[in-house]
């Protein structure tokens, strides 16, 4: 049986890794081994931070809603409890957007939540 050399397969594999490593700095872009190591790390960070992004945005929305609630003289937790009692089903993303871009409408929602308490 003839000996099989890995030339073509290796070249394809290296090309794939180096293509994904575009944009990395210095040897991490040019050298296969370093590029491969950095690519593994990058994939790990990307996977982890896709989960983290959801937490970060929720935290941002809560901060914005809390700031708008304080302007309307109510705490965030009392506001959210009032919304639940008033059967107003708006999520935090919508509430944060409303607090930033439509303060008058947000104030009306705050009043409805206050009445329900």
Curated annotation (Swiss-Prot):
**Pfam families (alphabetical):** Ribosomal_L20 (PF00453)
* Keywords linked to the UniProt accession: Ribonucleoprotein, Ribosomal protein, RNA-binding, rRNA-binding
Query: Any one Gene Ontology biological process term?
Result: translation
> InterPro entries of this UniProt entry?
Ribosomal_bL20 (IPR005813), RIBOSOMAL_L20_CS (IPR049946), Ribosomal_protein_bL20_C (IPR035566)
Q: What GO molecular-function term can you cite, just one?
A: rRNA binding
Q: Where does the chain cross the membrane? A: none
This protein's record includes keyword RNA-binding: yes
Record bears the keyword Ribonucleoprotein: yes
Cellular component terms, GO, for this chain's entry? Answer: ribonucleoprotein complex; ribosome
Which HAMAP family does this chain map to?
A: Ribosomal_bL20
Q: What does this protein do?
A: Binds directly to 23S ribosomal RNA and is necessary for the in vitro assembly process of the 50S ribosomal subunit. It is not involved in the protein synthesizing functions of that subunit.
State the family named in the UniProt similarity comment for this chain.
Belongs to the bacterial ribosomal protein bL20 family.
Q: What is this protein called?
A: Large ribosomal subunit protein bL20
Organism name: Wolinella succinogenes (strain ATCC 29543 / DSM 1740 / CCUG 13145 / JCM 31913 / LMG 7466 / NCTC 11488 / FDC 602W) (Vibrio succinogenes)
Source lineage: Bacteria, Pseudomonadati, Campylobacterota, Epsilonproteobacteria, Campylobacterales
The protein's gene is named: rplT
């Amino acid at each position: 049986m003839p000996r099989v050399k890995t030339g073509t397969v290796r070249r394809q594999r290296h090309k794939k890794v180096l293509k994904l490593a575009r944009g990395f700095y210095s040897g991490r872009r040019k050298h296969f081994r370093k590029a491969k190591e950095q690519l593994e790390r990058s994939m790990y960070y990307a996977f982890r931070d896709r989960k983290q992004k959801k937490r970060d945005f929720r935290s941002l929305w809560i901060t914005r809603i809390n700031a708008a609630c304080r302007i309307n003289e109510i705490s965030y937790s009392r506001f959210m409890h009032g919304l639940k009692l008033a059967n107003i089903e708006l999520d935090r993303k919508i509430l944060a957007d409303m607090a930033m871009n439509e303060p008058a409408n947000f104030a009306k929602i705050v009043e409805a939540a206050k009445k329900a308490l």
